[in-house]
């Protein structure tokens, strides 16, 4: 049972909150920003349909450098 619990925890995503400082990889390299919104239902962003749920939310993040708004799953983010 301990092994099963350890494996489950290994793959659990970190939960983030509005205002958290995070970073992620982009085509231009590592980017950092602040979470401004959390989506727990499917939503449209910049012409694309993003899938989100209570179990796997997506986050809107405002870039510190460019003010660009990006949408990512928690698995793509690193808390700063």
Ranges and model annotations:
Residues 13-75, 80:
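Basic/aromatic-rich interaction segments and small domains that mediate binding to polyanionic partners
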Residues 1-11:
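Short, Lys/Arg-enriched N-terminal segments with co-localized hydrophobic residues
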């Amino acid at each position: 049972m301990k092994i099963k619990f350890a494996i489950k925890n290994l793959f659990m995503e970190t939960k983030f909150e509005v205002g958290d400082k995070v970073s992620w990889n982009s085509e231009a390299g590592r980017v950092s920003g602040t979470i401004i919104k959390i989506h727990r239902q499917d939503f449209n962003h910049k012409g694309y349909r993003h899938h989100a749920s209570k179990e796997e939310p997506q986050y809107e993040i405002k870039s510190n450098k460019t003010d660009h708004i990006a949408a990512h799953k928690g698995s793509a983010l690193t808390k700063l």
